[in-house]
């Protein structure tokens, strides 16, 4: 869990591992997945949290949008499932999540989550995408 500026709490939780399209028979329940898969998912979660918390223009704009619109009709949902595919070198190939009502916020989050390298390669034969639960919780100061 990461507290940002004392008002916004962002957390990612591993939801499930799922296979690439066309490989449904390879699905693994998270409890049955190899430990290296769970460790890698935690690393991805940590990196996503770091990137969202970064003190830079896009991340600041996204966090401000969440703070301003949370709990409102046009605001972010309380929980968002982010599907992430990673390349063999640890870079984020793509992410997929339901769009927000604000196209700019949607693009900002997509930019943030695709911006870098998580620092490790996915474990051999790890099923993708990773499905990560993204919770936005506000705490009033």
Q: Where is each model-derived feature located?
A:
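Non-cytosolic coordination micro-motifs
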Residues: 11
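Charge-biased low-complexity segments
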Residues: 2-6, 17-141
């Amino acid at each position: 869990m990461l507290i940002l500026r004392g008002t916004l709490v962002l957390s990612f939780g591993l939801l499930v591992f799922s296979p690439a399209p066309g490989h449904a028979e390879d699905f693994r329940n998270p409890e049955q997945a190899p430990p290296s898969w769970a460790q890698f998912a935690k690393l991805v979660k940590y990196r996503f949290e770091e990137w969202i918390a970064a003190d830079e223009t896009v991340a600041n704009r996204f966090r401000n949008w969440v703070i301003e619109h949370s709990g409102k009709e046009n605001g972010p949902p309380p929980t968002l499932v982010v599907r992430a595919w990673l390349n063999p070198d640890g870079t984020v190939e793509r992410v997929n999540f339901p769009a927000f009502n604000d196209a700019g916020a949607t693009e900002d989050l997509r930019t943030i989550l695709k911006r870098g390298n998580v620092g490790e390669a996915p474990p051999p034969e790890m099923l993708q995408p990773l499905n990560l639960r993204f919770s936005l919780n506000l705490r009033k100061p």
